[in-house]
Amino acid sequence: MRSSYRLALAGVAAAALLAVGCSSSGSSGSSSGGANWATETSASGGGGMTALVAAAKKEGTLNVIALPPTWANYGAILSAFTAKYGIKINSALPDGSSQQEVQAVKTEHGTAKAPDVLDVGMAVALANTTLFTPYQVSSWSDIPTAQKEPTGLWYQDYGGYMAVGYSSKFGTITSLNDLLSPKFKGAVALNGNPTSANAALNGVMMANLAEGGSPGSIADGVAFFKKLKAAGNFSPVQATGATIKAGTTPVVFNWDYLNLPSYVGVSNWKVFIPQNAVLGGYYAQAINKGAPHPAAARLWEEFLYSQAASGGQNLWLAGGARPVEQAAMQTNGSINTTDAGKLPSVS
């Protein structure tokens, strides 16, 4: 990625955004062979991948949360994991936010329903490390140093660039200020609430950059959305694939891999990335330190960071997202070059 903000939600910023209107039965962790997977920090530490697979299969279940099947190819990823290991996946709140993920970790703590793993925005990851347990996947060295917590509390997984997706009926957008035109009345939406959803927050940050703001303050981004609202162009509807197909949200701020015509299912969908506001960002994986299925949680991470043709890294790539191990995969030849060639170009 050319650039990436490490964002933290300040209380003042969150309040400002709201003002704009953008708004028990657990596993013990032990397994055959004596490993306590609830505390193991690597597969090798617990006896290797064979032991991890056996322990995860014995648990038989994995709890995930906030993973929409159409988001970054997660539908295929979830199916591939179950097909490979025969482990049942319980998927909760598929359209939930990063903040809802950590809230579930807290409220479901000590129960069999607690999330085993999380996929959260960086602001939420950095603010909640006390909820995570360290684990380093087998391909740890292929994850850039700046994109992981040194002990393995979190590690970035996939990313992209913030973009504006829009119906071609509006013509061609060349600047965010074009969105202030009367023809965009009630059309411009975010993918969630920026006080809790990472994608929506980064949409505001992109506007902040385009308006000349700096990473240290989102005031200019908030001001832009105030102008959108004053013009009657901002829609409070949280954009989804369904709202895009229905024409309810014909202009959407979202990650480029979630703004592709193939993703939204609209053939006349166009994508605009402001060249004065190129904002890249990654999500991050983490394991709940109270995971009810600790071995399955670790096996899931191993699968996601696998560079095999049918592993998580190439499956994310097939969904239009940029996997965190992309550079290493290009070097060792494991990357799917066809899918890599489809990624939107950013200058």
What kind of feature is each model-predicted range?
Residues 19-33:
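Bacterial lipoprotein signal-peptidase II cleavage site
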Residues 47-57, 67-88:
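Short, polar/charged alpha-helical segment
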Residues 10-20:
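Bacterial N-terminal signal peptides
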Residues 1-12:
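Bacterial N-terminal signal peptides that target proteins for export
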Residues 123-127, 245, 249-269:
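A ligand-binding cleft/hinge motif common to bilobed small-molecule-binding domains
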Residues 159-161, 222-227, 233, 265-289, ...:
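Periplasmic-binding protein-like
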Residues 63-79, 90-106, 112-248:
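Extracytoplasmic ligand-binding site segments that recognize negatively charged/polar headgroups
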Residues 278-279, 283, 287-346:
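Mature extracytoplasmic/periplasmic domains
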